[in-house]
């Protein structure tokens, strides 16, 4: 998820005025900001969010025609393109176009001025592109983006630290009288602390993805471990789990760690869940309801971790003797069963969470594909469960037909029918060939 930074923008309005037919240059800038903020407020409605963002983009373009060297406008447009890709649930093809344009706009802005925030956002753009390429099974294209993301966030951290040191020196060298004149000392100090946490979180996300890449050389892996060492002291365990899991998986597969280390790490999720207060789902005024999102996130993260472990076990069966292979596949089946229970519990906390419904359906199909007796005996039930889950997701998302998620639901439901009842296949809704191809590339 994007958490791109905003700068303090010139001329930001506190009171909205009715737009004029022929706005001045400064008014164009303010209108673009208003439209962008309106899009932000409609993030839960991707189509409406996209319409506001597109109008904002057009307005920034009109402004930049008259003020091509305005850093704030270029910064805003670069960020807006990033947010379009991350907030509007577009097809990967369209997201990639937005992200590539965002890179170009970031580079134009950097020619005008270097700032930590723009390097930070640029790192996010490269990371988002890398994640799309990984999903498309193109690690050869993902890895250069990961490298660019690491370079960009390193620039951001260096500039941020330089700013912090200069600011601290200003305070220390000021006399008592001048010291009192320095505005918002505490607020500025908190800003640097928060910026450091954000940067550490982003580095962790990039390092986790890098660690899962086969193209990562051993020397680069060791450098990543050194980079992450101080970060592990700044962030809590939940924000570090992706890194720990990716690192441990690499060490286990490389024969440098015992499998037990990976299994022990999976237990962290249960420990963290046990620390959270219990929720009363029957009581809408439950005082513990504020921790519900954390429950859901932990359960989904736990499911992802168990699925990854199971998939690694299944991959290892290719070069294993038949008797041992059956034992390994049975372990994978059990792991996927744990993941299924976690997702079901997460769905209990939020029955209409479409991504959880899709993940549950995907998992049922994955379990049915394991060539062992228990899976084959359960196949029809698992397929039926998946069909029901896709159809519920479709009903909950039927008004969002322009999104990638909608296309994913429709096509996965269609593909499932090919496995269960190929004689009477019917699509839930029509899809363009472009949308079908976009989804098929990731199934």
Swiss-Prot record:
Q: Which domain of life is it from?
A: Eukaryota
**Keyword Cytoplasm tagged:** yes
Q: Where are the transmembrane segments?
A: none
Major subcellular site: cytoplasm
What InterPro entries does this protein's entry cite? Answer: TPR-like_helical_dom_sf (IPR011990)
Q: Name one GO cellular component term.
A: cytosol
Where, subcellularly, is it found? Cytoplasm; Nucleus
Keywords from the UniProt entry = Cytoplasm, Nucleus
State the family it belongs to.
Belongs to the UPF0656 family.
> What is the protein named?
UPF0656 protein C926.02
């Amino acid at each position: 998820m994007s958490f791109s930074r905003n700068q303090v923008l010139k001329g930001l309005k506190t009171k909205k005025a009715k737009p004029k037919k022929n706005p001045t240059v400064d008014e164009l800038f303010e209108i673009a900001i208003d439209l962008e903020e309106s899009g932000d407020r409609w993030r839960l409605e991707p189509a409406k969010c996209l319409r506001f963002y597109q109008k904002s983009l057009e307005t920034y373009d009109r402004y930049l025609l008259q003020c091509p060297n305005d850093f704030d406008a270029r910064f805003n447009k670069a960020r807006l393109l990033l947010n379009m890709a991350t907030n509007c649930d577009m097809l990967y093809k369209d997201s990639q176009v937005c992200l590539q344009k965002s890179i170009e706009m970031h580079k134009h802005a950097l020619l005008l001025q270097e700032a930590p925030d723009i390097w930070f956002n640029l790192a996010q753009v490269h990371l988002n592109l890398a994640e799309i390429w990984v999903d498309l099974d193109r690690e050869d294209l993902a890895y250069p983006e990961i490298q660019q993301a690491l370079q960009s966030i390193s620039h951001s951290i260096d500039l941020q630290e330089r700013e912090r040191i200069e600011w601290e020196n200003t305070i220390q060298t000021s006399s008592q009288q001048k010291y009192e004149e320095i505005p918002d000392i505490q607020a500025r100090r908190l800003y640097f602390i928060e910026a450091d946490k954000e940067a550490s979180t982003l580095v962790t996300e990039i390092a986790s993805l890098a660690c899962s890449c086969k193209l990562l050389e051993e020397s680069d892996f060791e450098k990543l471990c050194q980079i992450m060492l101080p970060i592990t002291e700044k962030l809590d365990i939940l924000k570090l789990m992706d890194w720990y899991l990716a690192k441990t998986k690499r060490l286990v597969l490389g024969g440098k760690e015992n499998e037990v280390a990976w299994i022990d790490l999976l237990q962290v999720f249960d420990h963290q869940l046990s620390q959270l207060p219990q929720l009363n789902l029957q009581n809408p005024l439950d005082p513990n309801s504020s921790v519900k999102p954390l429950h859901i996130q932990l359960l989904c993260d736990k499911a992802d971790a168990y699925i990854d472990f199971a998939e690694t076990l299944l991959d290892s069966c290719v070069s294993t003797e038949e008797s041992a292979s059956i034992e390994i596949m049975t372990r994978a089946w059990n792991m996927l069963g744990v993941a299924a229970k976690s997702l079901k519990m997460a769905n209990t906390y939020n029955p209409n969470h479409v991504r959880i419904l899709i993940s549950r359906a995907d998992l049922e199909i994955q379990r049915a594909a394991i060539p062992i007796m228990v899976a084959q005996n359960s196949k029809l039930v698992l397929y039926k469960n998946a069909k029901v889950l896709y159809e519920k997701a479709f009903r909950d998302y039927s008004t969002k037909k322009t999104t990638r998620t909608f296309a994913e639901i429709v096509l996965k439901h269609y593909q499932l029918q090919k496995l269960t009842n190929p004689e009477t296949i019917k699509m839930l809704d029509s899809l363009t060939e472009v949308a079908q191809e976009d989804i098929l590339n990731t199934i």
